[in-house]
């Protein structure tokens, strides 16, 4: 996945120079395996605490969009907005939603379109409305209407986010109370291990099935009809997961960039040994994102390391800290390949150190994952954090279902079966 995106970015480089904009970031979706040892730490449920914005903005330049620049779709977007407003006042809300969405897709940085759509949604979806107000402020930081709307919506959004994190913490505590040595928990951990490797590699284009992945990890035997590279990707992620589980989650000190390099060394150790654990020496392009130049990598990574060791993580909820760490690393993109996988391992190491199981991002969720990262690139990291939170909750639910006996046909049983289904109609 990483290599494909780099090639696509190279083809679009001239377009990037002409547009002179920094837009969507697409990265590989990487996961880790369930921990053998979880250490429960106290967590503070916060959203936008002191230092949160500073932590987010470190290493990431401010991005503003000139709403006055009209492209060929500008007029069409305003026409859709006008039609949406008419449908809204006529009580035809379903049609209004489609027209608002069309207007936003045609002019995604136009403040008036974002504001009107947000005001339309606020009563029924205040989280999405506040996100639209935030996007309007990114396009025009001095927009008084956008400021007023966001100030009105933000307290409600903070309360909802707080409730979401509290709910996940309660489920984490319930899971933590189950003996790690119990047979159901051991089975759940083992199955999750294979699930993580399978989904991680599938998202990057690896065609190994779940059963093939399990066979390679358990026997180290080759699977007929599959490339050496695909085998090596499975072996590399297997070693990286073992390193995270046996070393990082039991480490008393904070995670540093040295640990990140060690993760990467194992991720690419079989597939690309010459690049494993080394910063890139060439410029790369990831979709529409242009990472820092090679000569700036050491400075950027040192700044990232300073942030990891600072007091900022202590005021963040572990899910926020983990998601931010992941985002910062993929933004820098310090390696030629394997950045997404390494960032996901870093994120899950942070979660496990706080008593959470590692997040499972399913192959079929990749589109949403890319979209939330794209939104982060445009100034709002919170949709990405919420996505990570939902994935964390779903993972905990799967563990609880695996370790609880339910009657055949019970809703929980069906959920667990769906979570473990390796088939995907898109593959």
Curated annotation (Swiss-Prot):
Residues marked Important for autoinhibition of adenylyltransferase activity (site): 204
Annotated localization: Membrane
Regulation affecting activity: The side chain of Glu-204 determines which of the two opposing activities (AMPylase or de-AMPylase) will take place. In response to endoplasmic reticulum stress, mediates de-AMPylase activity. Adenylyltransferase activity is inhibited by the inhibitory helix present at the N-terminus: Glu-204 binds ATP and competes with ATP-binding at Arg-344, thereby preventing adenylyltransferase activity. In unstressed cells, disengagement of Glu-204 promotes adenylyltransferase activity.
Gene Ontology MF annotations: AMPylase activity; ATP binding; hydrolase activity
GO cellular component: membrane
Subunit structure and binding partners: Homodimer.
Protein name: Protein adenylyltransferase Fic
Organism in which the protein naturally occurs: Nematostella vectensis
């Amino acid at each position: 996945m990483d290599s494909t995106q780099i090639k696509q970015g190279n083809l679009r480089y001239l377009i990037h120079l002409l547009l002179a904009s920094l837009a969507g970031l697409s990265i590989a979706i990487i996961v880790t395996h369930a921990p053998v040892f979880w250490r429960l730490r106290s967590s503070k449920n916060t959203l936008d605490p002191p230092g949160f914005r500073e932590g987010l903005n470190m290493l990431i330049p401010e991005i503003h969009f000139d709403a006055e620049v009209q492209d060929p779709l500008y007029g069409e977007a305003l026409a859709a907005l006008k039609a949406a407003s008419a449908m809204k006042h006529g009580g035809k809300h379903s049609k209004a939603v489609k027209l608002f969405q069309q207007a936003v897709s045609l002019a995604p940085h136009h403040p008036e379109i974002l504001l009107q759509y947000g005001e339309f949604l606020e009563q029924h979806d205040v989280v999405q409305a506040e996100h639209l107000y935030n996007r309007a402020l990114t396009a025009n930081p001095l927009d008084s209407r956008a400021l007023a709307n966001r100030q009105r919506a933000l307290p409600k959004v903070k309360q909802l986010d707080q409730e979401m994190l509290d709910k996940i913490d309660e489920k984490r505590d319930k899971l933590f109370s189950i003996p790690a040595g119990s047979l159901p928990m051991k089975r759940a951990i083992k199955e999750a291990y294979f699930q993580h490797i399978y989904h991680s590699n599938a998202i990057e284009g690896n065609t190994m099935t779940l059963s093939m992945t399990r066979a390679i990890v358990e026997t180290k035997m080759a699977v007929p009809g599959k490339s050496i590279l695909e085998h090596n990707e499975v072996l590399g992620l297997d070693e990286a997961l073992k390193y995270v589980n046996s070393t990082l989650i039991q480490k008393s000190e904070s995670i540093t960039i040295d640990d990140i390099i060690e993760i990467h060394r194992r991720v690419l150790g079989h597939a690309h040994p010459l690049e494993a654990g080394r910063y890139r020496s060439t410029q790369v392009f990831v979709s529409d994102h242009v990472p820092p130049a090679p000569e700036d990598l050491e400075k950027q990574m040192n700044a990232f390391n300073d942030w990891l060791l600072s007091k900022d993580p202590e005021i963040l909820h572990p899910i926020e800290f983990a998601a931010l760490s992941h985002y910062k690393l993929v933004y820098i993109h310090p390696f030629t390949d394997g950045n997404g996988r390494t960032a996901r391992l870093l994120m899950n190491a942070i979660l496990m150190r706080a008593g959470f199981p590692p997040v499972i991002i399913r192959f079929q969720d990749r589109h949403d994952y890319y979209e939330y990262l794209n939104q982060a690139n445009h100034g709002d990291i919170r949709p990405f954090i919420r996505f990570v939170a939902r994935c964390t909750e779903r993972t905990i639910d799967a563990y609880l279902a695996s370790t609880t006996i339910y009657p055949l046909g019970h809703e929980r049983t069906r959920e667990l079966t769906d979570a473990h289904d390796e088939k995907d109609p898109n593959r």
